Amino acid sequence: MAASAARGAAALRRSINQPVAFVRRIPWTAASSQLKEHFAQFGHVRRCILPFDKETGFHRGLGWVQFSSEEGLRNALQQENHIIDGVKVQVHTRRPKLPQTSDDEKKDF
């Protein structure tokens, strides 16, 4: 199960131009199906990724929701309160990764 979540997260990261929301503070009682059901009210959801902790077997309380359209993502971001399993979760746009700097570049003195 963890391997399939890792493959799904990797595929999601590769789809740079896809509309993806980053969701934090997901209650440990919530499943990806609940996440998909909640966000489907804003637009068609292609997939939801909840990475699991190998040691505990529970998801890590964060995840990604990939929409089929930018409109779905915008609709979700415009909603102020997202409640899943009685808990208010935080929804953000996926931020592009910044280029890594080497240790030599960090030492600017």
UniProtKB/Swiss-Prot annotation:
Listed GO biological process terms: flagellated sperm motility; mitochondrion organization; negative regulation of mitochondrial RNA catabolic process; single fertilization; spermatid development
Record-level Gene Ontology MF annotations: RNA binding
Query: Top-down, what is the taxonomic lineage of the species of origin?
Result: Eukaryota, Metazoa, Chordata, Craniata, Vertebrata
Keywords carried by this UniProt record: Mitochondrion, Nucleus, Phosphoprotein, Repressor, RNA-binding, Transcription, Transcription regulation, Transit peptide
Protein name, entry field: SRA stem-loop-interacting RNA-binding protein, mitochondrial
One Pfam family cited in the UniProt record for this chain: RRM_1
Query: Quick one: signal sequence residues?
Result: none
* Tagged with keyword Protein transport: no
By its UniProt entry, which Gene3D superfamilies does this protein fall under?
A: 3.30.70.330
Q: Which gene encodes it?
A: SLIRP
Q: Which organism is it from?
A: Homo sapiens (Human)
